[in-house]
């Protein structure tokens, strides 16, 4: 399973790529694998404000529906509009084409996991 070392992760299986004072957010390979083929992605709008651990949207798949939680606080400055008509991008390419949001950070993110710690979390949940 792919767990890119350059990213940070949340305990609720979102990935975060920090780019200066912005962050790009999506769900991890493990999360999309557990959900199965996505059929719908509901995301906040540009200009919405997120707080850490606040529900920020949801995804629906052939297996289940699941909430998405904000791993960082800030203002949504971009949304991946392609997911509205092609939610399968999250399954096909969770770390690149399947990104979900770009956020202007309100503060330096805390309590995020590095790739090693996230790998340990996934291993503990997979059993």
From Swiss-Prot:
CDD domains tied to this protein: GCS_H
SUPFAM superfamilies named in the record: Single hybrid motif
Keyword annotations: Lipoyl
HAMAP family in alphabetical order: GcvH
Cofactors demanded by this protein: (R)-lipoate
Superkingdom in the source lineage: Bacteria
Record organism: Nitratidesulfovibrio vulgaris (strain ATCC 29579 / DSM 644 / CCUG 34227 / NCIMB 8303 / VKM B-1760 / Hildenborough)
Name recorded for this polypeptide: Glycine cleavage system H protein
Family of the protein in this entry: Belongs to the GcvH family.
Example of a GO biological process term: glycine decarboxylation via glycine cleavage system
Function, as annotated: The glycine cleavage system catalyzes the degradation of glycine. The H protein shuttles the methylamine group of glycine from the P protein to the T protein.
Database matches in PANTHER family: GLYCINE CLEAVAGE SYSTEM H PROTEIN, GLYCINE CLEAVAGE SYSTEM H PROTEIN-RELATED
One Pfam assignment: GCV_H
Transmembrane segments: none
PROSITE patterns named in the record: BIOTINYL_LIPOYL, LIPOYL
Modification sites for N6-lipoyllysine: 63
